[in-house]
């Protein structure tokens, strides 16, 4: 076991040191406005050369530093969380492969090398989702892999289309993509790929299903790697989104995703799925502000969200670990008494998610909402932004109400306490980052902050929405023994909203089961029904009837001759009468 512990610690120290180094280098690149474009010639054969390209700027270096920071803390956290697992060695290697794939995607200005990282993420995520080998995990892994395959196909088509232009380095063609109609096809395909990876409507169903993976994987995947890959790719292709119809389409889809995830989380009782739906809501927020042209704001929220979302998952993992793998929040309650440190960190992460002033989420989320108020958006988009913000606060307060207040609803013989120092170290480190990360990044990234001049009512609108959302979260979860749950009064609505607008059913049964049933009905109606009746069997029966009819003629020859003689005699008689 000591060998495995050291294995985790070596990975932790190695990744943490690289993360700090990259962060300092990214600050230098940011302040001096440096960009390094590196070409590495892998193979040169006569007139042919294979060249690998890397793009290092402040954005890629800073994102890599955050990915490595969270990865190192997740691996250190896994040292205790997965201590009873025999295959922890394999688990750490899979996580490292996952991080390597993400690195490849971040520093690539070339669609081919992006596809390597993109496919690497898809493949390793499948291996991690099915890590706990049971039927539910296999189904979730298959749904994750097949949903992401659509994006892979879109990227392959974009690569094929770029053959028309002589290079796969998309970064040279971004200006061309804004005006050239044929290059807009590449932008559309990349947008489709990003929508599948970042789980936008109609590809949202795989993200909550991926919660079948171990909790440390969820902390890594849903904070800074897999789901943010699509957002990061669109940040790189942000010039393409200046095309008005693509931007309008993305704004509508991402706004609806944000709204759908916020509503769904208010009717969910699985702890990890609630946090997964909050990730989906924040991804919709990033995509929508990106479609409005504020790519730096989207990147800023991407980084701050990575900090508090990883913290949320780690605290949830600690709670699940102590609850003996129970994830139902109705079984929890009064956890703040038995796990005070974990619950304190959990509440800090929740408040950062809600946009509580001076925490990490406030600096990015409040800025995004103020820029929305300054921009020219219609009432529907405005409603989606602010209503979704209220829903975020609503499900966060509901989650705290169910899990941390009231009475303990599980076995009374179940001792609970804070986890060991290994898990608590990662949790406390990220708590500090969730408190100071937003202000630190805002001072570093926006050297000349924009002047935002708004009336007092609009300035206070965000705070008002958060307060109303918190009150609603308390009221809808206030359930007593003599007071039924209000959701039961609207069962059909609850069923529709709680199942993510039936998207998991449509994505699985809708793609496989219903077409198969349609084929079965067609087979019975046409192949075994009308076509068989009018086709093969009908021809056989008709020929058989004609044959029998003709045989009747042959067997009754005397009668037929007499009948024909009489007919012809009558006809001749009539002709004679007519002539005379």
UniProtKB/Swiss-Prot annotation:
Transmembrane regions: 12-32, 50-70, 92-112, 113-133, 153-173, 183-203, 215-235, 244-264, 274-293, 298-320, 343-363, 367-387, 427-447, 463-483, 496-516, 560-580
Top-rank taxon, per record: Eukaryota
Keyword entries, A-Z: Electron transport, Membrane, Mitochondrion, Mitochondrion inner membrane, NAD, Respiratory chain, Translocase, Transmembrane, Transmembrane helix, Transport, Ubiquinone
Effect of residue 116 to S: In strain: Muheza
Any GO BP annotation: electron transport coupled proton transport
Outcome when changing residue 377 to M: In haplotype 24
Protein location: Mitochondrion inner membrane
EC number(s) given by UniProt: 7.1.1.2
The keyword Transport appears for this protein: yes
Catalyses which reaction(s): a ubiquinone + NADH + 5 H(+)(in) = a ubiquinol + NAD(+) + 4 H(+)(out)
Annotated S-S bridges: none
Membrane topology listed for this record: Multi-pass membrane protein
Pfam families membership: NADH5_C, Proton_antipo_M, Proton_antipo_N
Phenotype upon changing residue 32 to T: In strain: GMMK6
Keyword Cell membrane: no
InterPro entries reported in the protein's UniProt record: NADH_DH_su5_C, ND/Mrp_TM, NU5C-like, Proton_antipo_N
Class of enzymatic activity (EC top level): translocase
One Gene Ontology cellular component: respiratory chain complex I
Single GO molecular function: NADH dehydrogenase (ubiquinone) activity
Function: Core subunit of the mitochondrial membrane respiratory chain NADH dehydrogenase (Complex I) that is believed to belong to the minimal assembly required for catalysis. Complex I functions in the transfer of electrons from NADH to the respiratory chain. The immediate electron acceptor for the enzyme is believed to be ubiquinone.
Protein family according to the UniProt entry: Belongs to the complex I subunit 5 family.
Protein name per UniProt: NADH-ubiquinone oxidoreductase chain 5
Organism (species): Anopheles gambiae
